[in-house]
Amino acid sequence: MQLTKRTIHKGTKIEYSSKELLFLAMSGQPYRGTLYVNFTSLGETIDLVAFKKYITSLRAVKLNAEDVAYEVYKTIKESIEVDDLGIVVDLSARGGLQQRLAYGEVFSPVIKQNIFQIN
């Protein structure tokens, strides 16, 4: 899926997160998680409505859990020009197992308790 891009100021540091990540394991069992995206803009960013639709579209996709961070990374790289792109995914598998997966640039995601929290 190609994401819609928006023009912004070059050099803007951006971090997106969504607690609504849901996709199917190869077994058909659901994985739930939180997606964190971090990058420096080269003059473009993702349209947030399109990004939300993309995240929702993953619900119909079967992936190995270990591949989901790369899949999001690849989609963003194919859609907009960015620098320092990093993806972190915190997953909960059926049975309560927790995983943290990362692809691209290493970063520590800001995990907010509410939308008004400032670090």
Language-model regions, residue ranges each:
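N-terminal intrinsically disordered, cationic/polar leader segments
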Residues: 1-119
